[in-house]
Amino acid sequence: MKFKQPALLLFIAGVVHCANAHAYTFDASMLGDAAKGVDMSLFNQGVQQPGTYRVDVMVNGKRVDTRDVVFKLEKDGQGTPFLAPCLTVSQLSRYGVKTEDYPQLWKAAKTPDECADLTAIPQAKAVLDINNQQLQLSIPQLALRTKFKGIAPEDLWDDGIPAFLMNYSARTTQTDYKMDMERRDNSSWVQLQPGINIGAWRVRNATSWQRSGQQSGKWQAAYTYAERGLYSLKSRLTLGQKTSQGEIFDSVPFTGVMLASDDNMVPYSERQFAPVVRGIARTQARVEVKQNGYTIYNTTVAPGPFALRDLSVTDSSGDLHVTVWEADGSTQMFVVPYQTPAIALHQGYLKYSLLAGRYRSSDSATDKAQIAQATLMYGLPWNLTAYGGIQSATHYQAALLGLGGSLGRWGSLSVDGSDTHSQRQGEAVQQGASWRLRYSNQLTATGTNFFLTRWQYASQGYNTLSDVLDSYRHDGNRLWSWRENLQPSSRTTLMLSQSWGRHLGNLSLTGSRTDWRNRPGHDDSYGLSWGTSIGGGSLSLNWNQNRTLWRNGAHRKENITSLWFSMPLSRWTGNNVSASWQMTSPSHGGQTQQVGVNGEAFSQQLDWEVRQSYRADAPPGGGNNSALHLAWNGAYGLLGGDYSYSRAMRQMGVNIAGGIVIHHHGVTLGQPLQGSVALVEAPGASGVPVGDWPGVKTDFRGDTTVGNLSVYQENTVSLDPSQLPDDAEVTQTDVRVVPTEGAVVEAKFHTRIGARALMTLKREDGSAIPFGAQVTVNGQDGSAALVDTDSQVYLTGLADKGELTVKWGAQQCRVNYQLPAHKGIAGLYQMSGLCR
């Protein structure tokens, strides 16, 4: 078919490219009239036509960018022509090249935006792979910066665009009670989370409104703060209302200023504890490190002693199996035991937090006392981490010191001690101390995980900062309860999990106990959970027990047991539908049984569930409850509704949620915004799914939002090309972004909106346009196409009428066109054009 013939040129180019090591010569006479006026020398030497190509930029085989690159025709020392890419010094720096070490890169580039001289880097090469649309950059390892796992180069961090953004959610519920006194209750709830982004600054707020029954509605602000990243310090500065970090002391709500390290800005291997692998290589050797069967490190070392310090372990435990492959074919193998300490940092890594402000309790009647806090953690040699901190407030001072370390195969351990000096409102000054021990061990071979934490309160006067400050109130009321005045003497928590494989399932045990100093007895909490897969379904058993100490010394014990089973019905229904059954049996109250069917429809945009439950101890007829739930994941937000009915009551509810971004292009509505956000821009391509998120599609302009991006890391935002409108094409389906914390970054897709046409071109004298001539649509960037052997060219993104420019060698001509009234085969216009 004729409209496929333009592919001939790409085929010829591909053959030449793949065989450019050999001397091939194309017989121009085989092209007939199309050969007139065309120079075949470039094709004979395996070189493409110079111009702009959209390519994936590959550095040593790894894709680092996708962009339009200008290629110029140059000749090497032997006079052989080749296409040289125009890459700027700043672009090379973004790709990880140590541009500061090669000042000759600037020889041709007088400014950072001009083409750099890549030959300044010894043994560096750039090759255009036209078949795969790739620019292959081969850069010596010494000329590249060290790349770390879990973080992108700082040059790629993007603070995003100025924007106003807001999440909103609302729900209203109507409940009709039918038993005893009939009545109707209405409740409504609204939450707004507005924010502003300006440069690196992020301003955030959370405000809610609630009304229940006959009460009037009430607004309440949860927090307002401004923060930004200080990238040179790898830290964040926060001003306003927030909560402190809880690694050393308990988290404290405050209004003030906080400067703290941001782990997300630091490579995992530099901040997290990692073992040092030491050995001796007899020759130039390759060292391979495996953990849990996976290769986590591979490098080449020189003869002599070596120490590998930048390992990124894939799990929190698991021995490291090291193999040294010598150049003479011999190998060395040894094992390095490894466990992650409860608190552990990489050697030399410093983590800190500084806070000053006022205490911010959720109870508005609590005094806003001045507080200050400082914490410090530092990675020491010998697999140790030292940490400590101080807290100071009106009526309260505390200090803490601790040490964490690895015990090899025996697990990991950290121990810390704290001392407090405090005075509750209306009470005498108290002084106390506590010790905390944390132990963990993970046995990968048996699938066993064990964690234990033990607090020992050495004296009666130990209090936390919140214990003391919450007692000071300006309303004259003293919140006193007998439980608040109980003094714990110790507290223990443990967790044990055991995996027995796919068929036997997983078992988890949890437990905690609190012993009291001034009253006999203790509080206990235990839990057991087991789950497995059966024939594509799931089965789980859960048991929990809580024993709480009462004022008279007695205990109240509550047990609850539940059994849950789910089975997919897709083999019968042909879609994603499951049935479930659940039984819940508490020690107080009757047993409840529930059956349900749930599923998805419309490409996972619709979630639905139908449930029927029965409670044994309910009044006659009142134990049966029927419920229906529907949720729609739309391009402009989420919409849900539910309905439940029993003889005792009937309830209906509706909820909506979504996100709004106001930016320099306008307003974009979408699903709720989470974390850092990509503003997807595909002009003219409406209704196109983005990524794997149900319901996330471009709006009528081609815009949408995608949240939950990984900060300071490369994220790929993808369009589904199979869902593009008939008149739309994209030059690439993936865009890579590296957002900073809370940023709104642009993910721009280059679209061509318009008709597709196969045009036969002729010159004024009736002769054919030479083979390989370049055709561009005036006013359309990146629209170059090539003429085939039949003087035909395939064009996309055409308006109803316009102008084309045709170039070959030193000659050119122009074509004015107008689309025919009707499309041809496969929606393709077929027409002719006269080139003048």
Language-model segments: residues:
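Post-signal-peptide, soluble extracytosolic/periplasmic N-terminal scaffold domains
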Residues: K2-I12, V16-R271, W581, P586-V661
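Structural motif
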Residues: F43-Q45, M58-V64, A152-W157, V276-Q284, ...
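Membrane-embedded beta-strand positions of outer-membrane beta-barrel proteins
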Residues: M166-A170, N205, L237-L239, Y352-A356, ...
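Sequence/structural signature of outer-membrane beta-barrel proteins
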Residues: R171-M179, S208-Q214, K242-I248, G357-D363, ...
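Short Pro-Gly-centered beta-turn/loop motif in secreted/extracellular proteins
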Residues: Q78-L87, L311-S317, D703-E729, E741, ...
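Extracellular beta-sheet/turn segments enriched in Thr/Pro/Gly and aliphatic residues
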Residues: Q134-S138, A342-L345, G670, T733-G754, ...
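Exposed, low-structure sequence patches enriched in small/polar residues
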Residues: N463-L465, Q487-T760, G766-N778, D788
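Feature captures outer-membrane beta-barrel proteins of Gram-negative bacteria and organelles
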Residues: W157, N186-G199, W219-L233, K368-W382, ...
